[in-house]
Amino acid sequence: ECEGMMLQADGTPFDWFNTGEKYSLHGFVDDATGKITGLYMCKNECLLGYLEVLRQTLENYGIPISLYPDKYSVFFPPKKVNDHITIEEQLNGREKGITQFGRIVEELGIEMFPASSPQAKGRIERLWETLQSRLVTEFRINNIQSIEKANEFLIDYIKKYNAQFAIPATNSKSVFLKLPKRYDLDELLCVRFERTIDNAGVFSINNSKFQIIDKSLPPKTKIQIYLSQKIGMRVKANNKIYDVEPLELISKDNIDTNSLDYHQWLADVVIELINEFYLKDAKASYKSLA
């Protein structure tokens, strides 16, 4: 088996800082060598965490042939989403729904299939057992007590771990593919939506309303919206980027759960990003996001 043939993917909640509060560590591990290709900690297991692990993997190793996660809804859509396939998707040959993460790995040409049980992902389960012992000690010794500091520390820790614990693959050839230059990772590794603006340049995401500041776009223009921790919100139309401003920000409790864009994890991700980039200095009239 070659390095890069299959990466096991998972996340694990744990009391990493020995404070009684659990945080989720996301990771990919190479099945052939046991190398960690990426680690990233978030408050909860979520899309953002897996996107950052994918970013680390692409930047440091390249594109793997396949990814082997569990059936978590970040990776595979629930049945109610599978039942709502647009006509355009059907014409393009799609038979099932797809998640935001699934769309990204599909664009990269990565095959993704679900593990049937934790035992089927034995290598990454053993990794968690090791890290839950070693990382807690490392964090204590280095006085690390926050997610931000932990993620900074993990960059060098991965290198040390791999140097100590990785093993040679049965086949010495790596099958990681070099990331083509045409990819803009900041744009690729995003939550992505398509919307149509109204006569005032207004669009909405899960009932939160935004307006394009530039008034030159005609009504009914289709726009692409990109959301990530790296870039905040980026809006594009006709290959041009437009600045936006928030008009009405809606709390998690008021999100339309019947929307086809809605998943619990996706709603949380959108709220977290909007909160980070639009509510830090928001006016008091804006509704606070839960």
Predicted features and spans:
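C-terminal, beta-rich DNA-binding module of retroviral/retroelements integrases
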Residues: I158-L289
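Basic, flexible linker segments flanking DNA-binding modules
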Residues: E1-A9, F14-D15, D83-K96, S174-K181, ...
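The substrate-binding groove and active-site-proximal loops of carbohydrate-active enzymes
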Residues: G38-N44, I87-L91
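Short, solvent-exposed cationic patches
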Residues: E52-Y72, I231-V235, L260-V270
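Acidic/histidine-rich, metal-coordinating catalytic segments
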Residues: L58-G93
